[in-house]
């Protein structure tokens, strides 16, 4: 699966189109220049199919590319980062 992650700063979220207008989203805020990942949402009917992990991968890759520091308050994003040590250098707090 390849992800197409877009930052939507007006809505403070990263978006991943899933087809038919559906989106997987990761909500965030900005605190002291760091991206605080708050909540991840995948449509219920698509849960358990790996879209959350695909979204997390795309979000962390985007943040790494952009040189951002991250606080993962979202339990899903925090768990994903813990299982993927390559993103450890991005994490604060």
Predicted stretch roles:
Residues 61-93:
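C-terminal structural segments of small proteins and small subunits
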């Amino acid at each position: 699966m390849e992800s197409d992650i877009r930052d939507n700063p007006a809505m403070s979220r990263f978006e991943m189109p899933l087809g038919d207008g559906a989106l997987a989203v990761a909500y965030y805020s900005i605190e002291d220049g760091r991206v605080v990942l708050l909540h991840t949402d995948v449509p219920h009917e698509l849960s358990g199919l790996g879209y959350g992990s695909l979204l997390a991968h795309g979000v962390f890759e985007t943040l790494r590319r952009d040189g951002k520091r991250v606080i993962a308050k979202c339990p899903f994003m925090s768990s994903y980062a813990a299982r993927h040590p390559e993103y450890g250098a991005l994490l604060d707090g």
